[in-house]
Amino acid sequence: MRILIVNKFLYLRGGDCVHSLNLKQLLRNAGHDVCFYAMSYSQNIVCEENKYFAEEISFSAKDLQGKIKAASRIIWGIGVVQNFKKLLEEFQPDVVHLNNIHSYLSPIVAKLAYQRGVKVIWTLHDYKLICPSYSCLCKRNTCEACFTDKKHVVLRKCMKNSFPASILAWGEAMNWNKNKLSLWTNSFICPSQFMAEKMQQGGYPASKLQVISNFIGEEQVQYIINTPNPIREEAYAYIGRLSQEKGVESLLKAASRLPYKLYIAGSGPLEADLKKKYTANNIIFLGHLGIMDTIELLKKISFTVIPAIWYENNPLSVIESLCCGTPVLGRNIGGIPELIETSSFNRLFTQDEELPSLITKMFNTVVSANRDELSTAALQRFSGEHYYQKWLEVVGKE
């Protein structure tokens, strides 16, 4: 088959980008012809189809023209249509596989593919289709008000705590609504059962929702298998974005009361403030790590912690940890329980107050874990081959 993968960016920026790049390699290894569509950006991987990419826009533009251009992209997809049509005409895809496309690109790509009779598959990495501000959070609390009435994003200033930004998010949601998106899309891939249930609550038909967990890329698999396991440190780690919805400050508060070494691997808007605030010797900020450095960290620590306060979908950080044979302590929220309830060495928590005692318990219990067995089981569960077979089933659905 000829498959066109669409994502906002084409470099190792976040989980959606990692998934898109891994999917490309998986499908090419299976003998398919694959190309990309993204927004032009200086850090993108260079490929032949770069010439068709959408013009770059900035949401931090200060001038009126830049703001109008950004708003026009969000509401109407201005700057996307012409080149995407050209790519469809030249590449002639059998399947267009969408990932994160709102704002920097546009859902108009689903419409254009649909109008040409091309099958559209859409992997959902966040809750944008039912929550205009992506995260189902309002004032640090989970919120589902917009599942049935999008005006709440404006009333509560959910987007960046700004009326203009929230009005724009409302306009985007009203234009690219569930009726249009359901018509243009053959199947939505929900990486967790939790997400599929929330999509149904938001009005999307169950018949269009298929649950397939994310997978780990072949390059990562080989590195995990071929890298010797070091002696485990009496240390644990948080690996991910340093932003409010990730709940990392809850973990840092707990770590400040404990003697164990905590590695913080990641960057984001809270990075500078957290570094200033948490200066204890047992808390080590590593910054953003590449894929291979992440694996090496996972192999040497005792366990990871996922303290997210939002509805985590199917976090790659959990999958990568499990595939390295490293247990996980995760908040009982979103799709996290689906990933970690398969082993007695993993634990769930609900309240921040539980963290200090549970972290101590984790250190006491993981010492008896057979890391090789845990890794082997996870690598099989989250293999590319398993994902590919499920993907073929979805593509075959009408």
Label the model's feature ranges:
Residues 1-43, 116-119, 253-256:
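N-terminal subdomain of nucleotide-sugar transferases
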Residues 18, 234, 238-257, 269-272:
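A conserved mid-protein helix/loop that constitutes part of the nucleotide-sugar donor-binding site
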Residues 75, 353, 367-396:
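A charged, aromatic-enriched C-terminal amphipathic alpha-helix characteristic of glycosyltransferases
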Residues 115, 128, 144-187:
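Membrane-proximal helix-turn-helix segments that form the acceptor-binding/catalytic region
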Residues 272-292:
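Nucleotide-activated donor-binding/catalytic signature segment of Leloir-type glycosyltransferases, i.e.
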Residues 342-354, 361-367:
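Conserved acidic donor-binding segment of nucleotide-sugar-dependent glycosyltransferases
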